[in-house]
């Protein structure tokens, strides 16, 4: 779990749209559980979803996690979305944590099942403590500037 724990950027690609999520993978040694928690932003850096991952299965030999997630979209906060996600991490340098990964998640819309989508994702680790602090505690304008900058540089 130590290979993947930490703060991550996730580029989310769907036909005609790209967005970004900033999230954290936490490992609780006492309960031996992994949790994910993040916020997604559109291409303009506006927040559009909050989500958390649970029931995370780590498959160490494949550098892979599979998880269930639940969340809300800001425009339909009364509607709960959920799904399953999977991420495979690129092999890290010796003695280093993973730095990149890729995968997909399924965004299930129970109110309109025909809108359920599979979304491809790419991950890159964020190790700059200042960026992490700004994303977790900074002003909305700071988060917007960071998300658009990271997405444009991807």
Where are the predicted features?
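Central antiparallel beta-sheet cores of small beta-barrel/beta-sandwich binding domains
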Residues: 2-154
